[in-house]
Amino acid sequence: MRHHNGHTGFFFRIHTRRKEIALILVISMCLPYLSATFLEHYEQRRARQAAELLQEQQQQALEEQNTALEHFSELVTRSDYTAALDEINHLLSLDSANPQYYLKRAGLQVLLHNTDAAVTDLDTTLRLDPALYDAYQLRAQLSEENADYQNALADYQTMYALDPAQADVLMYIADCYQQQMDYENAINAYNTAEAALPEYREAIAYARGVCRYSTEDFKQALADFLKYADTDPADGELNFLIGSCYMNLEQGDYPAAISYLTTAIEAGYSADLASYNRGICYLHTDQADLAAADFEYVMANSTDSQLKTDTQSILDQLKQ
């Protein structure tokens, strides 16, 4: 930045105003001496003044940003997100290369339900700071909310690489595989999570059991579900899954299946499908009347056309 100095422009004024040639010659004779002394000190002083001015400007900018940040925090605390957005935009006008400001604005955009804008800010944040853990976390959560499990998985994997101490991320990695129906990788990921997070063993077993159930590995699925059973023994879905596993074992345990499916029905979980499965179990235990009652329930209450077709076929056979 240039500064006006009334004294140090002496030679410049002589030249620009085109003084008489005699004066110019006199000055030119003095130049070697002046360049070695006066001009050297002048440059040093100018550099020192510039550094002091720069430091002063930086301090002023820092104070302005700190004040704006305090105001921003107050606005967020008051849930005045629109005004807070104006304030963070002001901060970005002061420092457009600050990844933390983009991250804060992304958080505000989430609160304002502007998901696309939030993702754009998070992308910018991570271009500026590829190691910013919180930005990956928020972007992964937004991806999951939009059922974009592939990108969520990539962000969770990056998070774990950045900070392996945050082992709970392993559960999110496994869940992303599961949501994409990549059950084998999900099972492996849950195994890794279980080793790292023994305090969540039961919850991990339940989730892994669902994956194994989906691959029709009913024996291993049953073992996982039973690990979780004591946590919530009245849960309708859990009882349905356990009952269905017993029913589908190579050597089906139909009495056990009936017991768990009955609990699921009483809990109101998928009563039509649970009744159908229990009806099948009743047939295997020679209780045709009870089976027929369950199948009639399915016909009266189910909205699943394929399930009703299968049920009607069984009822027709029972009537023969």
Where are the model-predicted features located?
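TPR alpha-solenoid repeat register
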Residues: Y101, A135, V169, A203-I204, ...
